[in-house]
Structures are given as C-alpha cells and as structure tokens.
C-alpha cells in the first residue's frame, strides 16, 4: 500500500543572528541583550570554569580568527583544549605528513596536476566534493595524464579514470602494501632517491613482503592484474600525483592509511619535484589554515610541538603567559569529559556539533548538561539553541577581513564585501572584548596586526 503522506524535503531555514541573545535560565526562552550584557555574562560564565573549559574553533572562519581563538583558550583560559573539524577530518594526514616531511600539508600546488603524467585519486570523489581542484585534474587529463581511481564506490570521479580499482572497504593498507611489494619485486624502486632522502627501506621491504598480488586480490577484491598495472604505471611515470580525502583518513587506522600512501611516494621518488607529489584534499575553505593557526590540541601555530620546551618558551615570551607542557583534549575527548563532569563550559565558534556529531542525540544531551555554553555564529543553529549566551558574528566569506589557506597551502585574502546585518561583529573583536573582561588587554588594530603577530612566531608563515 502506497503512503499518501508527503515528506517535507525542504532544507531547514536558519535565522541570521543580528543581535546578542541571552537567557536568564535554561527553562526560559532567549531574550535580546546589549553587547555589554552579553559579553559580561559570557565572561562570568567562562571565567568560573577556567579549569574545566573547552574551545571549538571554526575551519570556515579566517586564519586570524583561528589564531586568536586558540590564543584565547591557551592564554586566557589556561588550556590546550581547543579543537575544530580541521583535525577531526584530516588529523591522520597531518600526523602522517608531519612525520615524513615535518609539515602537515600537501607537497604540491593545484597547478602541478595539470602537468603531471599520472594521477591517483584514492578515497576521493573530487569531482563532486572538490570541484575547483577537479578542474585542474581535467586539464591534466586533457594534457595527456592518465588517472586511476581507488575507491569502494564507482564515483563520478571514477568515471573519468582510465581504471577504477573498487577495493573492499577498509583494505587500503593491503592494497598499498601490495603495490609497494610489486614495485620492489619489479625492480622499479627509485634507489637513488631512497638512499638520499629516506630511512627504513629494509624494514619497509620486510613489511610488505607477505602482500603478494594474489593475496591482495583475495583481501581487497581487486583483480591482481589491476593492482599490478597501477603499481607499474605509478612507478614508471616521470611525474605522478597521489591524492586522497576522507576515504583514507576517516578510519580508526587513518594515520596508518596515510603513511602507507606516503611510503609509495617515497619508494618511487614521486615527491619534491614539479608535478610529482601528494595532495590531501581538505573539505572546507580553511581546514588547512585552522591547523596552521594552532586551533588543535597538540600543536601550536605552525604545527609547532607543545611538548618542545624551546617552542613553549618562544610563545610564552610573546604572549606573556605560561603554557602547560601537555596536550589538550580533542573534540571527542571533550564530549566524553562533558559526560563525566570534568568539562563544564564550552565556547563554540562557527561549529554546530549538536547536528554534525555522529550521535547527535548524545551530543545534545551532553551540551545541555554543561554549566555554561557560549555560541558565536551567524545563524541560530541547533547548538546555539542550547546556549546560555549567543553572540552574532560576521560571515567569514563576505563580511570579514583576513585570510584563509586552501589545500595547496595557498594563502588567500578575504575582503569585506557586505555590511554585516544588525549588530553582528567581527569574530576577532568579540574574542578580544571577552579577553579584556578576563584580564587580557589585546589590541589588534585589524586582521593584519594578527597576521603579523603570527608571522613572528610561526616559521611556516614568515614570508
């Protein structure tokens, strides 16, 4: 029997925030407030939870906002409990690339893929999810590049590939190891590069030795001939690009997945030359920048190690503070700490975890159990509906001055094109006003002043 009830498929309409909102108790509705009242309330609530505080920063906001947000957490609140979706989606890429190259970003520019000879899209549907990048891919194909797609699904990206390797979910490492073993046994290792620029080759050879093509076929579901073809094509190419996204990183063993791909690049010397490299494709406009700015619990700006005494001393001198020699809590750990009561207040900027977390019901329950929640956003999101104080911010892509950093680590200027509605204010100004109420008088004339402070502290942005 066919149902006659029509399902409403229209998207949820969000209300643009134009004025600060506060509530006098959790049982009462929001009421409009002045900025003075809202900031005073936010400062009192956060100040009372200095030892049990977490900051959610935003990968869609500017570099400058993310820098000031992590500084607020570390200097004003005395904690490294700061995180954002830039870590939750691509932390494995940062971990793997940092271990191999000392920096948690891709090694190539977008333009280089137009002039490469071979493209491997692994766990990435770039045609759908990264349309700007895929325009460069199409130019590369037009210029003669061959493309292979490794993905459990035959995606719209795979439709452009010369060959689609539809591996079973979770078998990326067996596939990569089989490719590596075939390259070794076929005598296709770039021995000069391996000797000059790598360590651990003998250990790697022993690691991949069990992964014969026939075993890999049984485990991955991909024909041995197809695996062999990709191995030879990648190793023999004069220049090859290896690209991945969340199909590689969002696994419990995501970092190992990334390292398995990096090893293929090192094995063949497909890195460090124009047109040859690795590209982790980021999901939002400033995912790369959020990590670069230190809006993560285990790194300071420039991916500098919190556990390094010399690094801490540099930041302590610049910020006139003392930094704890330990990592903060990740977003997941912060939600767990809400459950056990060790995290009592959260300052959430531009994120909507009440809707984006895998278990949204659990997220709502835990956020509702906080002593104090401040949300700074442009819309009254589901998370904002749970807040004690809501602060209206400017949109990061049309109403703000600053910069963002894309997947190829290109820093791009953002200029204000529209006047913010109502009383909406710049994120940085809001953060600085809150910091002042909590005893830290930061004077940034504009976003450029923030950028210049960052440049003085981060080796990756000194140019």
Where do the language-model regions lie?
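Domain-level signature for respiratory redox metalloenzymes
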Residues: 50, 57, 165, 169-375, ...
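N-terminal export/assembly segments and adjacent metallocofactor-ligating motifs
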Residues: 1-186, 196, 223, 265, ...
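Residues at alpha-helix caps and immediate loop-helix transition turns in enzyme cores, especially N-
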Residues: 65-69, 132-133, 256-257, 358-360, ...
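Short, polar loop motifs at secondary-structure junctions
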Residues: 151-156, 376-382
